[in-house]
Amino acid sequence: MSSTSSPPALVMGGAGFSYQLNPNPESLPIVDILLRAFELGVRTIDTSPYYEPSEQLMGAALSDPRIQSRYRRSDYELMTKVGRIKENEFNYSPDWIRKSVARSLERFGTTYLDVVFCHDVEYVSLDEAVTAVGVLLDFQRAGVILRVGISGYDIDTLAEVARLAREKYDHPVDVVQTWAQLTLQNTQAETRGFDRFRAVGVNSVFCSSPLAVGLLRTGGIPLGLTGDWHPAPQGLRAAAAEAAEWMDKHGGEENLCSLAMQYAIVKAKQNCTPSFSVSTITGISTLSDLEQNVVAAKRVLKAAGDSENLLDYTELDSQSVESRLALCERVRLMLGEWLDYDFTGKKPKTLDGKSAREVKMPGAVSIAAADDRDLKQSAAVGVLV
């Protein structure tokens, strides 16, 4: 939806249709989910070949007559990835990148992809990542890819790959995607990432996993065929569970899941400028997930008129945001020492180089913004909920 003037408040993450998060994704009513998502104004889809079999399932759904009779290809955006194949298998070679893009085009039955990301760039060398970006830029010049991106968790690596790519090709990386770095538990995308990305020409950031990969919700992390893959240590899990229980008792119409979603959406919107956009990607695998996420978003956004379409909700509802400050403050206080905990085990750093646990983080208890890398069981790291 390149014609949309405002960045999407919510992007549908396709990892919900993967074996990592669902033992039987083929059984999901994906056509119904996509139809309802499009009706509600969730028109951008993010996935990856790594989220097997998400691309195949969504490609088949998008070719269904019920969707094709109502929506043109230009009515929605498709974002996918290249380079990551399995949990411990990557292929960033130019030949494979080209094959992967061609395969995604075939699976989606389209002649172009809106965004293609190099997937989890921190797991390969800087040279491999930069070379892969160059291959995607070739596709961009041919009109096959509209925007070129890189994705991963590590902000330092993302910023360095973007810098090196711009230096080598005299063309910026258009888009960055990072996961679990703009949440109630971790705001390092804001405190350490956005300024660095802007400085090297990035104009759009997608922050996925607003629930910290399923951590910030009642019931704990989701389990797929890969079992308990979550990188959070037990202390953080316990703090999140305590916060979820407190929200169930005292959160009123909100639970920890909806509050975390709203916090991420508000943070994203507050960091948007006319030349730099931030959006939230959330995993969706059921109609209930979709409806609840859209309702949560609308509670902190406002539209010019009475509309069901989330695309019309382009501004923050300042009164609603203000009313949630105390809840956000309480949850972040309960997370305590685990604020900005890095899932890779690295100590988070502020811009002045100090450990984030050695200083009081700006906005540590406020929703308002100021104007070993090989993870165990990482099959779902970057699989986003």
Predicted stretch roles:
Residues 15-28, 82-98, 120-127:
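Active-site mouth loops of central-metabolism enzymes
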Residues 12, 45, 58, 78, ...:
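Conserved, mostly hydrophobic/aromatic
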Residues 105-124:
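Active-site groove signature of glycoside hydrolases
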